[in-house]
Amino acid sequence: MRLNTLSPAAGSKSAAKRVGRGIGSGTGKTCGRGHKGQKSRSGGGVRIGFEGGQMPLKIRLPKFGFTSRKAMVSAEVRISELAKVNGDVVDLSTLKDANLVTRNIQFAKIVLSGTIERPVTVKGLKVTKGARAAIEAAGGKIEE
């Protein structure tokens, strides 16, 4: 072992650099902030997206789109999740009881993702073509 081969242990963390502790430390006096200016001051700095008073890009570009209110009360349920439903009938209330959708959901759609082993009867839910084929192949049925 020699002095030039010594190194910190693997995974160890070096101590935080202490600023304002003299010229020899490398971060004395101005503490790495330079001279004057907004960024050198306490609490200095500009908000995200600020462009120095120029009209920001976010405001220069036109508005577009909207948030569908129906999307907030709609949900998709995977076909593999239907195994968590107790009983043979799957409707909105049984999906809520099985915690597959939240209480505020009013519309649900069953999509093909995964597999289903047992036959179930789907009532009052939308079903994709692939999910419909998989449910019927497992011996289940869909009632509108």
Swiss-Prot record:
Keyword Ribonucleoprotein found: yes
Superkingdom: Bacteria
Gene3D superfamilies the UniProt entry points to: 3.100.10.10
Gly residues compositional bias, start-end: 21-31
Record-level GO cellular component terms: cytosolic large ribosomal subunit
UniProt key word Protease: no
InterPro entries: Ribosomal_uL15 (IPR030878), Ribosomal_uL15/eL18 (IPR021131), Ribosomal_uL15/eL18_sf (IPR036227), Ribosomal_uL15_bac-type (IPR005749), Ribosomal_uL15_CS (IPR001196)
GO biological process: translation
GO molecular function: rRNA binding; structural constituent of ribosome
Keywords: Ribonucleoprotein, Ribosomal protein, RNA-binding, rRNA-binding
Annotated segments matching region Disordered: 1-48
Function: Binds to the 23S rRNA.
UniProt family annotation: Belongs to the universal ribosomal protein uL15 family.
NCBIfam families the UniProt entry points to: rplO_bact
HAMAP family, alphabetized: Ribosomal_uL15
Subunit comment: Part of the 50S ribosomal subunit.
Protein name per the record: Large ribosomal subunit protein uL15
